[in-house]
Amino acid sequence: MATLKPSFTVSPPNSNPIRFGSFPPQCFLRVPKPRRLILPRFRKTTGGGGGLIRCELPDFHLSATATTVSGVSTVNLVDQVQIPKGEMWSVHKFGGTCVGNSQRIRNVAEVIINDNSERKLVVVSAMSKVTDMMYDLIRKAQSRDDSYLSALEAVLEKHRLTARDLLDGDDLASFLSHLHNDISNLKAMLRAIYIAGHASESFSDFVAGHGELWSAQMLSYVVRKTGLECKWMDTRDVLIVNPTSSNQVDPDFGESEKRLDKWFSLNPSKIIIATGFIASTPQNIPTTLKRDGSDFSAAIMGALLRARQVTIWTDVDGVYSADPRKVNEAVILQTLSYQEAWEMSYFGANVLHPRTIIPVMRYNIPIVIRNIFNLSAPGTIICQPPEDDYDLKLTTPVKGFATIDNLALINVEGTGMAGVPGTASDIFGCVKDVGANVIMISQASSEHSVCFAVPEKEVNAVSEALRSRFSEALQAGRLSQIEVIPNCSILAAVGQKMASTPGVSCTLFSALAKANINVRAISQGCSEYNVTVVIKREDSVKALRAVHSRFFLSRTTLAMGIVGPGLIGATLLDQLRDQAAVLKQEFNIDLRVLGITGSKKMLLSDIGIDLSRWRELLNEKGTEADLDKFTQQVHGNHFIPNSVVVDCTADSAIASRYYDWLRKGIHVITPNKKANSGPLDQYLKLRDLQRKSYTHYFYEATVGAGLPIISTLRGLLETGDKILRIEGICSGTLSYLFNNFVGDRSFSEVVTEAKNAGFTEPDPRDDLSGTDVARKVIILARESGLKLDLADLPIRSLVPEPLKGCTSVEEFMEKLPQYDGDLAKERLDAENSGEVLRYVGVVDAVNQKGTVELRRYKKEHPFAQLAGSDNIIAFTTTRYKDHPLIVRGPGAGAQVTAGGIFSDILRLASYLGAPS
């Protein structure tokens, strides 16, 4: 503090500067010409010598010369003090929802306090809905609606209640005094508007900007209550903008910087609460920064201060890759370049207004989008990443997608356009003359046509202007048509890496094609920051989901439908539940079950069924089963890159759907043997489709449950080996029966035991007939290249002929012991020869035939060594001729069968790009 007496002269010795405070060197000023300045915060105090004048000088470095002060509070300073600039500043902007009520204002104050930056400038919007309320006041007054008075009272009450909840004592009295004074002035102004029936733009801007004044004042009081020094800034005193012809404003950075220095010299503080949205013209007329003006205010202030960063606080966790209201899978983007953010903003993404980015780009100041209601979310950083940024190289080439709806496409076409200078100028001159805005332009390289998109509300004026301007060309035939295509939308794909990544456009258009979406027009600049397409408005959401899924969902994200939630299907669902998190985290395999259907009820979901509750949900919320709706849900109602139906039934009707599913691009996985062992012509048609398409059909579990029988056979064939013979025990039930048909036990006794243990089908005749084994033989034969049908196989049935006509399972089981003698004799004969009986299927590839029969094997033969329900398959090939290749293991049971199906699902994922 300096103390000056009247007629007292202060002279710096040797012209050295007087040092006040300890600001950084960049704030140290030496200006040769003295300037006259009224010092801030003078106050008189009592004391000897006729009264002292105390001058509290702000914390600056000054170069000063002093003059005599004779009873006046003036002194000659070398120059006006400049505000310090640089990374010591952080700028925050809080939108209307952030200061929507008293508690939220407290939350904002807490964020400010917890920011460890040396200096902070905070830009605030009006409280939520207040700006709309202010403009509504103006509209009502202009239309001479007396309710403007009650509406003004509502504005007053909203702020009065908020202030009373936040403030007390002198702070409350001071704020309410300012508030009531402002309301009184507004009432007079609105009365004038009411009488005139009109309000000028500057008049309206002045009225509308009061919400920011009140919220900034309240917040500054709240921050000061915590003990921190804080000043509030009316940015109309600082920000100077020039109106443009497009009803926008351009900042005058030079003049604004001067006024900021002047303001700071009078109001030094390390925390400044500034009004957003409002500014002044060079003539000091109040104005606004128009749409998203508070964001723009923060960006301008950040640039003026050369701040470390500008944080935009809002009510979302950051910038999404697409509108989350339209795309469930939209993700928060960690980083965006300035160009990417600008492009996404231009094309309608709710990020920032494009002009907000311009001021900070000048000084490479990052913008951070944060959620005031979720402080743990890191948000999105908008900055210019280094060209060699490793993380950037690993990201998808497309950062995000945005759409603009309610557009119309105008196509100007004609052979007379080619090579004629000025045609494009004339076209877009017409657009300018009617005040329309061109959103996108596309021109054929032949110059035969130009098409462009404009807002639909402006298309009639534009088309009429064009037809008037080119009427002679239309009559002469130089132009063939001026066509208007209404009800359009623009879809833009944005990404800085698109410029260096081949195939992005191919991927984009293939995704649209798969979704059956037609593209009306295409535009891409040479910078390749965006690819823009025009589509039907009705296809806008569908297209957005399609392209987003193609770029942002892993190629190993599978939309799954499970048919048959019986024993096998239920076990599979439980296995998926237990393993899903591990697969997603460690292998990037995202399995989403969108449908479960039985014969009577089905359960569908758009985002994925909760597999921890699928039984409960199916029972409580299941609807009537409908395979067409089920298929549509799994494949047609979303844009997950891949769809797969898993058929866990033994139903021929379900198997008959495979061809249609594969043709639609749905992968099929199944243990159901009916399709591969059915009529040969249908099987060949199915396999032909599979070979010609890129859709996969896996059926490992049809033969060996969880054993790798099919994959082993294919591996032999694909590596050039030749199959001579396949022989095996491939029925877990019949393996169990003959492994236990020993000693004095009767065959019927073993069958009864197996049935009671759940090893057989509900009707054991389904196992004993040999049909199941025969189907497996047919599958193996066809895999080996043999064209066999079930009718071509001799099958040894273990069902006694007289019992085939039994009308019930009970009757069959009751009469079965009567026929134990024949099998007992065969077993005894085998034992007398040192052999055992085994029920086997045989593929004789050399002689092009197959059989299902009861055979005898030496006790040292691998087939005689089985136990329980194990299966065993022996492959005799040109490579494995003397010693067959043997695959052995459990061949029955819900767990191993479901495991075999699960293995096929993971195999499909690996084919689609999952890491090995």
UniProtKB/Swiss-Prot annotation:
GO annotation, biological process: lysine biosynthetic process via diaminopimelate; methionine biosynthetic process; threonine biosynthetic process
GO MF annotations in UniProt: aspartate kinase activity; ATP binding; homoserine dehydrogenase activity; metal ion binding; NAD+ binding; NADP binding
Location(s) in or outside the cell: Plastid, Chloroplast
Keyword Amino-acid biosynthesis: yes
Pathway recorded for this protein: Amino-acid biosynthesis; L-lysine biosynthesis via DAP pathway; (S)-tetrahydrodipicolinate from L-aspartate: step 1/4; Amino-acid biosynthesis; L-methionine biosynthesis via de novo pathway; L-homoserine from L-aspartate: step 1/3; Amino-acid biosynthesis; L-methionine biosynthesis via de novo pathway; L-homoserine from L-aspartate: step 3/3; Amino-acid biosynthesis; L-threonine biosynthesis; L-threonine from L-aspartate: step 1/5
Stated name of the protein: Bifunctional aspartokinase/homoserine dehydrogenase 2, chloroplastic
Assembly with partners or alone: Homo- or heterodimer.
Native organism taxonomy: Eukaryota, Viridiplantae, Streptophyta, Embryophyta, Tracheophyta
Chief place where the protein resides: plastid
ACT domain ranges (all copies): 412-487, 493-570
Organism: Arabidopsis thaliana (Mouse-ear cress)
Family: In the N-terminal section; belongs to the aspartokinase family.
Region (Aspartokinase): 88-336
Catalytically driven reaction(s): L-homoserine + NADP(+) = L-aspartate 4-semialdehyde + NADPH + H(+); L-homoserine + NAD(+) = L-aspartate 4-semialdehyde + NADH + H(+); L-aspartate + ATP = 4-phospho-L-aspartate + ADP
